[in-house]
A protein has these predicted regions:
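Aromatic- and Gly/Pro-enriched helix-to-coil junctions and flexible linker segments
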Residues: 77-256, 362-409, 426-443, 447, ...
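Short polybasic linear motifs
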Residues: 46-49, 388
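Bacterial N-terminal signal peptides
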Residues: 61-72
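Sequence context surrounding c-type heme c attachment/ligation sites in exported
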Residues: 74, 79-129, 136-150, 609, ...
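Extended surface/linker regions that mediate inter-domain or inter-protein docking
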Residues: 159, 179, 187, 191-196, ...
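Conserved structured core elements
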Residues: 86, 90, 124, 128, ...
């Protein structure tokens, strides 16, 4: 991995880039006042972002109390003899090593060789697990005849907690003075839009490397490293967006309209006269490129006048547009308007190429279609297109204002040039900039002008260098010349805006930071409320649930077309949108977070309603009241969650159990032990038993029981839902190879019952969800932990657990309403720590 000092602002003078058609030296483009070298792992506590297989907490999340005053020690007695490392080692040898020693390591934890180096993050995590188990009375096991006394346990707990606190202090002291976090792809695109008024497609193939994810999160500093391939791509991207925002000459938009005849492309069977007008006839399989030769970042406005012919009892056709051969559409809508009342649909996008497709039928002959019967009625869903119009380049009024503010009105006024450049750089770098830093960019402009470039070309070179700087690409916290544990006002402004907007602070937030006012509680609360009310908070309501719930995995294993013919991209997109819109509704209405576990409503469009066996009008997502017989409510019974925990062929109870344990309960699930025989779903007798039956038999093995008893029940609660989230009353053999309804295979009653490790029983998803609600405090702490991970861009460790519990506890009196939880997080000490 190349050191980030090789970014353009730190290149030696021999390194050159091409800009504006010729080579340019960027050494002078960047001030010498660059931050301290960026570590190979860009975020603090890099070790905290690595899964530690030696540490497990299968039953509950790892809640560690880091303060002696908060220890939940039930015993008040003190150890008679002073407790030290020797005492603890003897304690382990007497009570623990039989199960956690050389011959046996239950839970992948070995204590006879556990080091006493509490400053080490990994070792500290293991000691934290020991503290949790001893303090909770779970270890040593109650069945052991020779158990330690309450006095011994209290002494060991107090000693471990003290040493853990010392270890935390040592790690803080050892942390570097500066932390850097690379922008994610989506954040880069958001900033470019907010700063330059350019909508840049960061997902375009070949533009940027895909961001490495850690447990679903895409913004974790320790895994968003900088490779050599990134550097050139960042420069090219900066040059591209600046050339669009500050062109040599602003070109007027060109409007191109394709009428029905042109759309038909000479194919007479694609033209039809309906309602006195010649129209282009489109049906399933119809595909046409309607826009090409665009430039990434230049927006195009697309308008189309369309109507539909829907057969009696049939579905409506869907008009879909795809960009740059991407699998997900940029526009997808059912067309319901009759032929005598066509509608105009429109959208805008920043893409290079747009292809139109129509979905709705698959039974017409593509070469010689006969779409109408003898009475002129449609046999299949058909789309009538009167015309399609494109307008490019398309710039919104807001975008025009942003772009106009980038360039000084009077290029000959040196003071105005410096002032405009200073404001842009301060906004781009999200911190105060010095006159010396700006002077280097002014010199670059003058150098370019002397070389014969126009002012706008020279100015573009300066803006490009600013955006190619690591000061832009990395979020910096801390300072090389001072060692501090808390972030300053400017860093707090960035942390808040990236958390809620996925982008840079705006002028009002920066003004509060510049005045040194933002860390004042009343100012911070006011700014927090303002950011929530801004439409840009919609980025948070999409990004956080997508990453927290790992919705990127929906469609990773596309369902078998033979087994699930109804599954398509439209359904997949609807599944994901149900979940993100559900989160957004809880956010918007400030509902209690128990709604995530169980609710009497969901968000739904007609496509998803059909999938659920329900009814809903229209293609837009709306809030729908649920009935008990709908078998829905909360996140866990949404199709997106049920699908991402399946494998494309069948549902996977173990996958579902692991997902619930890790995502909803914050537990750490260890890998399966070596040499475990996998289930054979194709063995001769597989047709006589369900997957549940085979798992029950598998879990009776002694080596499997310990883990499966904690994982499997969580997944068994959702046995009544198949691999694509449909509810079912009967189960199927584990080796099924035909779609639902195959009369030849035997049927079995669904068994969705289970017993949790604490002895509580349930039968079905609804009873299980009620048990989850009983443990609402635990879920609240897990949610806070995930929110903090997203906000602070790093993995939470046991050093953070006391603060996480404090944030959750402060939200309890308001029923854990989501905005209350967010407010308590933002105003917490944790949020302002480096």
């Amino acid at each position: 991995m190349t050191h980030p000092s090789t970014l353009p602002d730190a290149r030696p003078s021999s390194d050159r880039f091409r800009c504006g058609g010729r080579e340019r030296d960027f050494l002078a483009a960047t001030p010498p006042h660059s931050p301290a070298p960026i570590p190979a792992l860009a975020g603090p506590d890099a070790a905290g972002a690595k899964a530690n297989p030696s540490v497990i907490s299968l039953k509950y999340p790892l809640w560690i109390t880091a303060s002696l005053g908060l220890l939940a020690v039930t015993q008040t007695a003190k150890a008679a003899d002073p407790v030290d490392a020797k005492f603890v080692r003897t304690y382990f040898a007497t009570h623990c090593v039989r199960c956690h020693g050389e011959k046996k390591q239950s839970g992948h934890l070995r204590l006879d060789t556990l080091a006493f180096n509490f400053a080490d993050q990994t070792i500290g995590e293991q000691w934290g697990e020991v503290l949790t188990q001893v303090n909770g009375g779970d270890m040593p096991p109650k069945k052991e005849q020779s158990r330690p006394s309450a006095v011994e346990n209290a002494g060991v707990v107090e000693w471990i907690a003290t040493e853990l606190k010392k270890g935390e202090t040592a790690r803080m002291a050892a942390r570097g003075p500066v932390s850097h976090f690379r922008l994610s792809r989506n954040e880069y695109g958001n900033i470019v839009h907010d700063l330059l008024g350019v909508r840049f497609d960061v997902d375009q193939p070949g533009l940027f490397n895909e961001d490495t994810r850690w447990r679903g999160f895409e913004n974790i500093g320790s895994v968003l490293t900088l490779s050599p391939s990134h550097i050139e791509k960042y420069f090219n991207a900066a040059e591209a967006v600046v050339s669009i925002a500050v062109p040599e000459k602003v070109a007027p938009p060109a409007i191109t309209r394709q009428n029905a005849t042109k759309l038909a492309g000479g194919a007479k069977n694609r033209l039809v006269e309906r309602s006195g007008q010649v129209r282009h006839l489109a049906f399933m399989g119809s595909a046409r490129r309607i826009y090409s030769n665009g430039v990434n970042g230049n927006e195009v406005k697309v308008r189309a006048q369309v109507s539909a012919l829907v057969p009696a009892g049939g579905a409506a056709p869907r008009l879909t547009f795809y960009a740059d051969n991407q699998p997900q559409p940029i526009f997808d809508r059912e067309i319901l308007s009759p032929e005598d009342k066509p509608i105009v649909v429109e959208f805008d996008a920043a893409v290079v190429e747009i292809t139109m497709r129509v979905h709705g039928t698959s039974r017409l002959d593509q070469k010689n279609p006969q779409p109408f019967d003898d009475e002129g009625k449609p046999k299949e869903p058909l789309l009538l297109i009167d015309w399609i119009e494109t307008e490019a380049p398309y710039v919104t009024e807001e975008g025009k204002k942003k772009r106009e503010s980038l360039v000084p009105v009077d290029p000959e006024n040196a003071a105005e040039v410096r002032k405009t450049l200073h404001r842009f750089t301060e906004r781009a770098w999200r911190r105060p900039v010095t006159d010396a830093e700006i002077a280097d960019y002014v010199k670059l402009i003058e150098s370019e002008k002397k070389a014969g470039e126009s002012f706008r070309s020279a100015y573009r070179a300066a803006l490009t260098a600013i955006l190619a700087s690591r000061n832009f690409i990395f979020i910096q916290e801390g300072a090389a010349k001072e060692r501090r544990e808390r972030i300053n006002d400017w860093e707090l402004a960035s942390r808040l805006s990236f958390f809620l907007w996925g982008s840079m602070p705006d002028d009002e937030l920066s003004t509060a930071a510049r005045a040194g006012e933002l860390r004042k509680p009343e100012v911070l609360r006011k700014q927090f409320a303002r950011l929530l009310a801004d439409p840009k908070s919609g980025r948070f309501t999409k990004a956080f649930p997508r990453q927290w719930l790992q919705l990127q995995n929906v469609g990773m294993f596309p369902p078998d077309k033979k087994l699930y013919p109804e599954y398509d991209r439209h359904l997949e997109a609807s599944m994901i949108q149900e979940t993100t819109d559900f989160f957004a509704e809880v956010f918007r209405e400030n509902l209690p977070i128990r709604e995530f576990l169980t609710s009497d409503w969901t968000m739904m469009n007609r496509r998803l309603a059909t999938h659920y066996g329900m009814s809903a009008e229209g293609q837009d997502f709306v809030r729908v009241k649920l009935r008990p017989e709908d078998h829905r409510g909360g996140l866990l019974t949404q199709a997106a969650i049920l699908t991402l925990t399946s494998d494309g062929t069948r549902h996977r109870p173990i996958n579902r159990g692991v997902w619930i344990a890790e995502v909803m309960l914050g537990a750490t699930i260890p890998p399966p032990p070596p040499n475990v025989e996998p289930l054979n779903l194709t063995r001769p007798d597989a047709g006589k038993s369900t997957l549940r039956m085979q798992l029950d038999a598998h879990a009776t093995t002694a080596s499997c029981l310990a883990c499966h008893s904690k994982i499997d029940p969580l997944g068994f609660a959702f046995e009544a839902y198949d691999a694509i989230g449909r509810w079912r009353a009967v189960d199927r053999p584990s080796n099924f190879r035909e779609p639902v309804g195959n009369a030849k295979e035997p049927q079995f009653p669904v068994n969705a019952s289970g017993v949790l490790t604490d002895g509580r029983k349930f039968d079905g998803a609804e009873e299980f969800k009620r048990l989850m609600v009983e443990d609402l405090d635990r879920f609240a702490e897990t949610l806070v932990k995930n929110l903090a991970t997203f906000a602070l861009r790093r993995a939470m460790t046991f050093d953070d657990e006391a603060e996480i519990k404090k944030i959750a506890a402060a939200s309890r009196s308001d029923q854990y309403r989501l905005r209350t939880v967010l407010a308590n997080l933002v105003t917490s000490d944790l949020f302002q720590k480096r």
